[in-house]
């Protein structure tokens, strides 16, 4: 004769196991949802900071030429323009230069909108890339006190490049090195297999790992407050990446404590 004894605790657990599993599932769902919500809030906060920084910098960039033009016009109003023609000419040239600067800034912002679409048509032709980059380097040597060197081992023309856009893309990288990098900037042009490789190297303090992927995002600037001492809207590197990709190439960033390298790979078409 056998006697069976049912443990009431075990029986209660069996009966409530479904409820326990559902409760655990609900708790897990709530926790995951909270983490997802926090991620969205953090992302929205970052976007808000980028937007505010962009608006602040655009305002600052536009205020400078507008203030210069206003000063020039006011000066012309307050002296005899007919008697002092040289001064009048100087103020008019100053105003014209600032108006041209405003036009370029507006064009740059509008052009950014076309990069993600098929509206941007590249006018490709045979290009002496070494000569092109040499002219860019010479221009920046005049504009900055930093040391910029150029080296190359290629002696051929690239058959299919849009000179205007490629020049702007490379200029953006050198301009970025001047603004954010150290005193030494190296521009190298080399042939690797079927590609022409262009590197822009500077000895600055580098870019933090968590910022490196985002520097190519549209309007993104490394968050350091309202850096009006550094000009720009945060579209230069984005523009460069899009233009290089439209040429079938790639652009990469490698940054350590004392070195930052931007590397462009262009196919030798």
Model segments located where?
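Conserved glycine-rich
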Residues: 183, 248-253
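Short alpha-helical segment of the dimerization/phosphotransfer core of two-component systems
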Residues: 97-102
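Short conserved segment of the HATPase_c
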Residues: 207-221
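Short alpha-helical Gxxx[C/S/T] motif in the catalytic ATP-binding
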Residues: 236, 240
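Short beta-strand/loop element within the Bergerat-fold HATPase_c
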Residues: 184-194
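Conserved catalytic submotifs in the C-terminal HATPase_c
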Residues: 123-126, 147-157, 161, 192-193
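A conserved beta-strand-to-alpha-helix junction within the catalytic ATP-binding
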Residues: 123-138
């Amino acid at each position: 004769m056998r006697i069976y004894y049912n443990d009431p605790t075990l029986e209660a657990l069996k009966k409530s196991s479904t409820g326990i599993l559902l409760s655990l599932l609900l708790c897990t769902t709530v926790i995951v949802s909270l983490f997802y919500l926090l991620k969205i809030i953090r992302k929205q906060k970052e976007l808000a900071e980028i937007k505010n920084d962009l608006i602040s910098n655009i305002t600052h960039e536009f205020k400078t030429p507008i203030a210069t033009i206003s000063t020039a016009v006011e000066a012309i109003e307050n002296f005899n323009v007919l008697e002092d023609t040289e001064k009048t000419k100087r103020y008019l040239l100053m105003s014209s230069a600032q108006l041209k600067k405003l036009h370029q800034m507006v064009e740059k912002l509008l052009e950014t909108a076309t990069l993600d679409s098929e509206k941007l048509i590249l006018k490709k032709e045979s290009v002496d890339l070494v000569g092109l980059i040499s002219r860019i380097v010479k221009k920046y040597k005049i504009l900055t006190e930093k040391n910029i060197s150029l080296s190359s081992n290629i002696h051929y023309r690239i058959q299919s490049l849009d000179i205007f856009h490629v020049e702007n893309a490379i200029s953006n990288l050198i301009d970025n090195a001047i603004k954010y990098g150290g005193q030494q900037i190296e521009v190298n042009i080399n042939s690797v297999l079927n590609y022409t490789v262009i590197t822009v190297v500077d000895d600055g303090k580098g870019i933090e790992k968590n910022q490196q992927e985002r520097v190519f995002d549209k309007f993104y600037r490394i968050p350091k407050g309202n850096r009006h001492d550094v000009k720009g809207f945060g579209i230069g590197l984005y523009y460069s990446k899009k233009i290089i990709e439209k040429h079938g190439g790639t652009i990469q960033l490698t940054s350590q404590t004392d070195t930052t390298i931007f590397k462009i790979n262009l196919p030798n078409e």
